[in-house]
Amino acid sequence: MDINSLLNIAAAAAKDAGTHLASFHNTRVDKEDGHDIKLRADKEAERVILDRLIPTGITILSEECGLLPAGDSNYYWIVDPLDGSLNYLRELPMCCVSIALWQGEESPVFGVIYDFNHDKLYKGIVGKSATCNGALIHVSTTTEKSKSIITTGFPVYMSHDEEGLARFIRILQDYKKVRLFGSAAMSCAMVAQGSVETYHERNIAWWDVAAGVAITIAAGGRADIEILDKERHLLDVFLSNSIITKD
């Protein structure tokens, strides 16, 4: 398996989808369900990506179409064609295309995130390096939680009852500042490039963070991942600069 060739395919797919999203701002809402929202744009971006990925013969898991089995290898394309759909709908410039290659459910190989609003392409191969538009990026060197920024969010499947919110607040209290960007993938990219020290979300979907996890690890960071619901692909994810700890 030629990882560099596959990375180039993923990067081209992300750029194609992002260019489409940036140039054709179709904001038709196909479905709203509680705290979730689906746009026609998600499906159109996914179609653009699948045209690139299907010929590779690797199984695809995408937020919109679900699982597309291919072959018998243990590799997966993990795709979120538009992460930050509500931001996109409201013209808040914090959304992106996210594509990752994983081996099984526990081993990220590489990730690609395209921030099409700012024309920034993040790439990272685990065990090698991470870049943004070709320039090397690295996680922060901050050593104290009290001087650190954590980014998080309110995932679709998060419990919004009193106990769930209290647990959420307890996690944040030790940090200097909290940022909610409305895009899990972009939050991960912020950790990878050293803009923030940590990212933590519970009940976040695999496709939301798969690329960001790979890029953060490639940039010198650490990922602590717990599978919460295998059928729905829900995780507890804590990314850090490898210095700041979860507890």
What is each residue range found by the language model?
Residues 1-14, 18-19, 166-173, 186-247:
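Oxyanion/phosphate-interacting regions
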Residues 1-82:
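N-terminal subdomain of lithium-sensitive/metallo-dependent phosphomonoesterases centered on the IMPase/IPPase/PAP
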Residues 17, 21, 42, 53, ...:
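Residue-level signal for inorganic ion chemistry
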Residues 59, 110, 149, 197-198:
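Short, Asp-centered acidic motifs that coordinate Mg2+ and/or phosphate
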Residues 71-131:
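DPxDG-like acidic metal-binding loop motif
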Residues 88-91, 178-184, 204-205:
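Short glycine/threonine-rich catalytic loop with a Thr-x-Gly-x-Asp
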Residues 132-136:
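A structural micro-motif at secondary-structure boundaries
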Residues 137-159, 172-181:
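Short loop->beta-strand "edge-of-pocket" segments that line small-molecule binding or catalytic clefts
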